[in-house]
Amino acid sequence: EQNISDVVELERAGAQIVAVDATDRTRPGGQSFADFLIQVRLESDVVLLADVDSLESALIAESLGCEAIATTLSGYTDIPAPPLPNIRLIEQIANRVSIPVIAEGGFSHPQSVKDAFSAGAWSVCIGTAITNPYLLTKNFLTAINQA
């Protein structure tokens, strides 16, 4: 769970951009995202990347002044989502906001990256697919064994 001190510490450590949970989940102490963001803006000048799970949370994040949106939390909250990567959500958000949309979550094939850019993504974040050598090797072995 993220709180204001986390954001301030990250900024002091040199972070210029901090990702924040921009869903409707309650923060520590029962704080809403809007209240959390107001507090962040009072205590920090860091650029905020809103990690969202839905079009609604993306629209709210933009209206509250977040500088960019990432689809990081699609499929990780109570809101139903298709299998990752959620290209449909990327397209919905990109068509409705004026800030950069970073496609994140489930990108492991070049075609899905291409699809994300075609859907309007400003950038694509690839994580586990390249940072987890065990998973990467397992995927190659699975493909080899199916050949």
Predicted regions and their residues:
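Active-site-adjacent beta->alpha loops and helix N-cap segments on the catalytic face
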Residues: 1-6, 22-41, 55-60, 77-94, ...
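Catalytic cores of alpha/beta
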Residues: 2-10, 53-65, 97-103, 107-126
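Catalytic domains of carbohydrate-active enzymes, especially glycoside hydrolases
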Residues: 12-17
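Conserved beta-strand positions in the central sheet of alpha/beta enzyme cores
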Residues: 19-20, 49, 70, 125
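Short secondary-structure boundary segments
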Residues: 22, 52, 73-74, 105-106, ...
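A short helix->loop->beta-strand "cap" motif at the edges of active sites that frequently abuts
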Residues: 45-46, 99
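Histidine/lysine/aspartate-rich catalytic loop segments that bind and position anionic ligands
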Residues: 47-81
